[in-house]
Amino acid sequence: MNFTAFKASIAREAPPSELSLALQALWWDAKGDWDKAHECAQAAEGAAGDRAHAYLHRKEGDQANAAYWYGRAGQPVSTSPLPAEWEAVVRALLIS
């Protein structure tokens, strides 16, 4: 799946079945369901899930928790605008 198809899929009621849990987290975030997004990020394992988890906590304003998850993901704390970070993470996860 490419980024354009991912964005188009957000119009559906449920995420495409082939998406990883980390991508499902970002899909639910785009739908405005932070709680469901967080559930997916918590269930995801590895750096991809940690990266989605970091973004979600940064978005909710919990900078200390976000910093913890950025560290687990091996990433610096993002200072990008949230929409730009969301897109960058989605694009990175789609090619990984």
Describe the role of every protein-language-model region.
Residues 1-13, 26-39, 91-92:
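Repeat-mediated protein-protein interaction surfaces in helical alpha-solenoids
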